[in-house]
């Protein structure tokens, strides 16, 4: 917080050095004058913040009291904890399974831990943990351990085999299935906090929880992840007010057993695909959480957010260099989002809900609107030589400081690096989004080398790469020209003048 205080003092000092005309409300250069796009973006952010506070401070506490009042009757008769592990270090695996098994014992109902793994070493470790915990905590008559061995062909296969293993147990109608990543550590009491909502709300098909992280890597990565999870908490809480979260995070989400054992659901998670107008049909490699989310969304069921239940994820950035690691992660995250985006929009606002549906539409719009500010300033500067560029960067510093303070509604601390990381996420993240949007078929895991072969010959593969680059350049050019015409930084030649030239 000391760093943030120094940032605020520097901001105030620079403000005193700015020309007085920039602070004059009657001046056309008044710093607080917002364009239409800027007002929309900031208004949209404030709306999410307000909805988040309403959900966490007013709506959710009422839900919590109602769930607590149900007592033991609110818990399902059987809980399945499906944990997928592949190429996770031994210490993280130990923490993850220890937390999962202890929660299975602690929840007080019949529980089955299903470990979907590749290496035999993991199986031996998990068995030792299980027997040690059951001997120490008791509950051996209620808690079982099962293994699903797969060939390292990817997380989608691991989940599909795990869901089929759940089906073989013939779970009762009120059972729940929790899907946990191999790097996600459950907080004590998570199951008893969250599972009662299936009983309280019969129309809820799934839920997800809050996340924090332990980052193995450079301090800048730690700050970036912490900031993203704070933003996630606000956005998820806002969407929780509508009963339609925008993703069922793969780190920890829970489903009704009747959904998780539905053959169509399992097939969707195992082999999902889209038909693209230019790229043709291609399967999804990553984004299993988006596939499961879309299935529940299509069924018209609610998906809620449980803000007081938490998992701790162990994060290993794919590169020690911040820029490279962030780029690799953004390509995967944004690709997962955009590949499912169009078909979710196609469901329509009546099925999805008006506010969630518009949020999904906004996922596409925001990659362009977020670039409008820096692009507009650059165009004006190039065409007029105006010192507006200095005003713009001060405005960025000021507004990102304000945005950083709003994150205190989600977390106890913020960092002086957040204003810079927020702007990095906005501008560079939008650049990456536009890149991915025109190359939806490019997919890659950051932890494994699993790939999907599309069966294209060399000529067609090169043609698709070339057309992807072409439409990307065309889209960016249209954006710049359209914005330039709107700002009158670019002028269309007079038609009469062109006729005379001919």
Tell where the protein language model's regions lie, with residue ranges:
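Membrane-embedded multi-pass helical conduit in multi-pass membrane proteins
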Residues: 12-42, 362-444, 479-502
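Loop-to-transmembrane boundary segments
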Residues: 1-5, 82-84, 89-93, 352-369, ...
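Juxtamembrane amphipathic/hinge helix adjacent to a transmembrane helix
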Residues: 343-347, 444-460
């Amino acid at each position: 917080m000391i760093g943030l205080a120094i940032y605020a003092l520097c901001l105030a000092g620079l403000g005193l050095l700015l020309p007085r005309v920039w602070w004059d409300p009657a001046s056309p250069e008044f710093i607080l004058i917002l364009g239409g796009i800027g007002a929309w973006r900031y208004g949209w952010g404030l709306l999410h913040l307000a909805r988040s506070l309403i959900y966490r401070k007013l709506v959710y506490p009422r839900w919590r009291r109602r769930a607590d009042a149900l007592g033991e009757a609110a818990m399902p008769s059987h809980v399945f904890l499906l944990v997928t592990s592949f190429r996770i270090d031994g210490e993280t695996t130990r923490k993850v399974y220890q937390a999962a098994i202890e929660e299975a014992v602690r929840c007080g109902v019949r529980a089955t831990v299903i470990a979907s793994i590749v290496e035999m070493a993991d199986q031996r470790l998990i068995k030792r943990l299980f027997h040690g915990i059951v001997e120490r905590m008791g509950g051996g008559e209620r808690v079982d351990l099962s293994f699903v061995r797969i060939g390292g062909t990817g997380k989608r296969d691991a989940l599909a085999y795990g869901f089929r293993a759940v089906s073989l147990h013939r779970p009762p109608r009120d059972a729940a299935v929790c899907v946990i990543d191999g790097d996600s550590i459950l907080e004590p009491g998570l199951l008893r906090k969250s599972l009662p909502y299936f009983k309280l709300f019969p129309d809820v098909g799934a839920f997800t929880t809050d996340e924090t992280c332990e980052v193995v890597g450079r301090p800048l990565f730690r700050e970036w992840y912490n900031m993203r999870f704070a933003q996630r908490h606000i956005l998820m809480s806002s969407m929780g007010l509508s009963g339609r979260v925008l993703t069922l995070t793969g780190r920890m989400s829970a489903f009704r057993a009747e959904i998780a054992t539905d053959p169509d659901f399992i097939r969707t998670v195992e082999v999902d695909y889209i038909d693209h107008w230019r790229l043709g049909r291609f399967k999804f490699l990553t984004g299993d959480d988006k596939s499961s989310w879309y299935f529940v969304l299509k069924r018209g069921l609610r998906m809620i957010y449980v803000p007081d239940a938490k998992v701790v994820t162990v994060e290993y950035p794919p590169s020690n260099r911040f820029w490279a690691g962030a780029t690799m992660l953004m390509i995967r995250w944004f690709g997962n989002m955009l590949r499912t985006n169009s078909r979710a929009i196609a469901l329509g606002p009546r099925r999805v809900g008006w506010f969630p549906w518009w949020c999904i539409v906004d996922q596409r719009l925001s990659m362009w609107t977020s670039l409008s500010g820096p692009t507009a300033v650059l165009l004006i500067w190039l065409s007029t030589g105006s010192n507006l560029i200095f005003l713009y960067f001060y405005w960025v510093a000021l507004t990102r400081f304000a945005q950083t303070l709003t994150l205190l509604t989600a977390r106890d601390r913020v960092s002086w690096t957040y204003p810079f990381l927020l702007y990095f996420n906005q501008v560079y993240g939008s650049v990456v989004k536009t890149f991915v949007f025109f190359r939806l078929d490019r997919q890659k895991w950051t932890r494994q080398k699993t790939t999907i072969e599309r069966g294209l010959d060399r000529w067609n593969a090169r043609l698709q790469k070339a057309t992807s680059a072409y439409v990307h350049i065309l889209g960016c050019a249209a954006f710049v020209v359209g914005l330039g015409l709107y700002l009158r930084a670019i002028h269309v030649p007079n038609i009469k003048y062109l006729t005379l030239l001919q």
